[in-house]
Design a protein with these regions (language model features):
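Short, glycine/charge-rich flexible loops or terminal/linker lids adjacent to PRPP-binding catalytic cores
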Residues: 1-31, 41, 92
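Generic structural signal for helix capping and beta-alpha/helix-loop junctions
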Residues: 10-12, 35, 67
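Short, flexible coil/linker segments at or flanking structured domains
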Residues: 13, 18, 45, 83-86
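A contiguous pocket-lining binding segment that forms or flanks enzyme active sites
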Residues: 20-62
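PRPP-dependent phosphoribosyltransferase catalytic core
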Residues: 47-116
Length: 116
């Protein structure tokens, strides 16, 4: 049996799984699938959550990753940072585009984009 699920987030940003989903994780081999991994922060929360709920993480895969590994787990990705010229990920106070007051064109997330 293969289960595919996504976590919810509580008020402090922790990933949680409801009671009806927990049996899909507890004692199971888990493959974490991501679209994009930039800093690894969300991936770290995913690892913490899956281990908390008793899952056995067997792999991490993504379409793009700027991170090679997390928590001693290799990240397997189709594209890496070296494949995207001039790729950068910054904290807002370190962003060179922000410092140059360069405006952004849109906000993009899993539901689409909104032009600004």
């Amino acid at each position: 049996t293969i289960y595919i699920t996504s976590p919810e987030y509580n008020s402090v940003g922790q990933m949680i799984f409801r009671d009806n989903i927990q049996p899909m994780i507890y004692g199971k081999n888990v493959l974490i699938l991501n679209g994009a991994i930039t800093t690894g922060a969300t991936l770290s929360r995913a690892v913490e959550s899956i281990l908390y709920y008793g899952g056995k993480i067997r792999g991490v895969a993504a379409i793009f990753s700027a991170v090679n590994s997390i928590a001693q787990l290799p990240v397997h990705s189709i594209f890496q940072q070296r494949d995207i010229p001039d790729y950068g990920s910054y904290k807002f106070h370190d962003c060179p585009l922000c410092k140059n007051k360069q405006k952004i064109d849109a906000i993009v997330n899993g539901w689409g984009y909104s032009k600004l």
